Curated annotation (Swiss-Prot):
Gene3D superfamilies: Ribosomal protein L33. It is found in: Plastid, Chloroplast. Keywords: Chloroplast, Plastid, Ribonucleoprotein, Ribosomal protein. This is Large ribosomal subunit protein bL33c. One of its GO terms (biological process) is translation. Pfam families: Ribosomal_L33. Its main location: plastid. The keyword Chloroplast applies. GO terms for molecular function: structural constituent of ribosome. One of its GO terms (cellular component) is ribosome. The keyword Nucleotide-binding does not apply.
Length: 66
């Protein structure tokens, strides 16, 4: 039997450099990834280096609230 309910949470990662620069004419949008994290192992907000197709480079993507 499962010990707890909803241990794995679905989170959305958003590009921090796109958000900081704002959506302007140069950038057509904001890069977002959907992933899961284990609440017991990572209680803090998740930050990963992912590729941003709008910045054309690897940037830090941080967890946002739903």
């Amino acid at each position: 039997m499962a010990k707890g309910k909803d241990v794995r949470a679905i989170v959305i990662l958003e590009c921090t450099s796109c958000v900081r620069n704002g959506v302007n004419k140069e950038s057509p949008g904001i890069s977002r990834y959907i992933t899961q994290r284990n609440r017991h192992n990572t209680p803090n907000r998740l930050e990963l280096r992912k590729f941003c197709p709008y910045c054309y480079k690897h940037t830090i993507h941080g967890e946002i609230k739903k």
